[in-house]
Amino acid sequence: MKLLGEKFPSMEVMTTHGVKRLPEDYAGKWFVLFSHPADFTPVCTTEFVEFARKAEEFKQLNTELIGLSVDQVFSHIKWVEWIKDNTGVQIPFPVIADELGRVSNQLGMIHPGKGTNTVRAVFIVDDKGVIRLIMYYPQEVGRNVDEILRALKALQTADQYGVALPEKWPNNYLIKDHVIVPPSTDEASANERKEKIKAKEIEAFDWWFVHKPLK
């Protein structure tokens, strides 16, 4: 089981695009690795179509997509062909064939009571090879690709500007598209913030809840 902040383990995998080395082949880029329970299943098909439709948006964020299941590479190839023939959507990203479950077990994608199939896991790995986000969905519930994109944008924004992002950013109920300034770490800076709030020099609910436009 891997944890947030850990390095993504080095591994060599077989995919529909040939052999890949993770995370080395994606050095300098972010990548989203997502597992699905099985090929030729309805929920997984809807997810793959949406990931493919949004693939260019991920690329614009310097991010590559990688699928994974415990199926054989031949099954992946035929399923990808089926998707294109029956939905008109081309799957542009590689899909890992983890038929022995080695990668899935190493990453904690196979959960108790679910047999040898993976749950719907999502790993977001940054351009330094560090695991930044992990999501798990049950086999019976499909993922929201827009939420994965939102989380990716939020992580990159936090890194670039040194801020935190609120619920549903950039459409938060309380502060709309504003970002959250890190809280004061000592009494002096907290008091300074209180004075700025009184003078209406900064936007805040309190000294520990300061927000601002991103730019």
Curated annotation (Swiss-Prot):
Biological process according to GO: cell redox homeostasis; cellular response to stress; hydrogen peroxide catabolic process; response to oxidative stress
Keyword set, alphabetical order: Antioxidant, Cytoplasm, Oxidoreductase, Peroxidase, Redox-active center
Catalyzed reactions: a hydroperoxide + [thioredoxin]-dithiol = an alcohol + [thioredoxin]-disulfide + H2O
SUPFAM superfamilies in UniProt: Thioredoxin-like
Species of provenance: Caldanaerobacter subterraneus subsp. tengcongensis (strain DSM 15242 / JCM 11007 / NBRC 100824 / MB4) (Thermoanaerobacter tengcongensis)
Class in the EC hierarchy, top level: oxidoreductase
Homology family: Belongs to the peroxiredoxin family. Prx6 subfamily.
PROSITE patterns: THIOREDOXIN_2
Pfam family name, one: 1-cysPrx_C
Matches recorded under HAMAP family: Peroxiredoxin
Record-annotated Thioredoxin domain positions: 2-157
Subunit structure: Homodecamer. Pentamer of dimers that assemble into a ring structure.
Record lineage: Bacteria, Bacillati, Bacillota, Clostridia, Thermoanaerobacterales
Keyword Cytoplasm: yes
Protein name: Peroxiredoxin 1
Gene Ontology CC annotations of this record: cytosol
Additional notes on this entry: The active site is a conserved redox-active cysteine residue, the peroxidatic cysteine (C(P)), which makes the nucleophilic attack on the peroxide substrate. The peroxide oxidizes the C(P)-SH to cysteine sulfenic acid (C(P)-SOH), which then reacts with another cysteine residue, the resolving cysteine (C(R)), to form a disulfide bridge. The disulfide is subsequently reduced by an appropriate electron donor to complete the catalytic cycle. In this 1-Cys peroxiredoxin, no C(R) is present and C(P) instead forms a disulfide with a cysteine from another protein or with a small thiol molecule.
Residues binding substrate, per UniProt: R120
Subcellular location field: Cytoplasm
